[in-house]
């Protein structure tokens, strides 16, 4: 077992639905510690920078517009196999394909408004965490 850190974002649709506490409870019940957190309304430049890896994909503009449509909650999760554990909690990107009981199955409306983001690998987790948090903002 490897202790890892991963970035998680509760997206504007889930913030609007007021399910932040329910999502945090799932993280904690799965053994993930929230070691940094902030609420932020992303600027267009911040959203474009964060999702730059997708800039040539057809959904990029819609994704950026969605991510700046309201506030998000950004957190760093820490725990054993945190990346895989968080991805399991989130469920499939498309909530229609997500297993019952996952965050996306329970709280997401569509593949676009899919409630949460989570890092997919250790290198991207480290990069994504650095994008939003300085070392002095992380307590773990």
From Swiss-Prot:
Using the UniProt record, give the first listed, main subcellular location.
Answer: cytoplasm
**Where does the UniProt annotation locate this protein?**
Cytoplasm
User: In the UniProt record, does the keyword Mitochondrion occur?
Assistant: no
Q: Which residues bind ATP?
A: 11, 59, 87, 93, 104, 114
Q: Which domain of life is it from?
A: Bacteria
GO terms for biological process, alphabetical:
CTP biosynthetic process; GTP biosynthetic process; UTP biosynthetic process
**SMART domains (UniProt xref):** NDK
Q: Name one Pfam family in it.
A: NDK
* Active site (catalytic residues): 117
Classification via InterPro entries: NDK-like_dom (IPR034907), NDK-like_dom_sf (IPR036850), Nucleoside_diP_kinase (IPR001564), Nucleoside_diP_kinase_AS (IPR023005)
What's the cofactor?
A: Mg(2+)
Q: What is the similarity comment for this entry?
A: Belongs to the NDK family.
Q: Describe the protein's quaternary organization and the partners it interacts with.
A: Homotetramer.
Name of protein: Nucleoside diphosphate kinase
């Amino acid at each position: 077992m490897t202790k890892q850190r991963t970035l998680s974002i509760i997206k504007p649709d889930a913030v609007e639905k007021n399910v932040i506490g329910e999502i945090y409870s799932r993280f904690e019940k799965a053994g993930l510690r929230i070691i940094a957190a902030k609420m932020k309304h992303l600027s267009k430049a911040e959203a474009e920078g964060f999702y730059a890896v997708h800039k040539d994909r057809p959904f990029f503009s819609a994704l950026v517009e969605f991510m700046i449509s309201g506030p998000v909650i950004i957190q760093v999760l820490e725990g054993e196999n945190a990346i895989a554990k968080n991805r399991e909690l989130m469920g499939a990107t498309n909530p229609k394909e997500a297993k019952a009981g996952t965050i996306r199955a329970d709280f997401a409306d569509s593949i676009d408004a899919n409630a949460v983001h989570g890092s997919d690998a250790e290198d991207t987790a480290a990069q994504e965490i650095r994008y939003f948090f300085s070392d002095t903002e992380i307590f773990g």
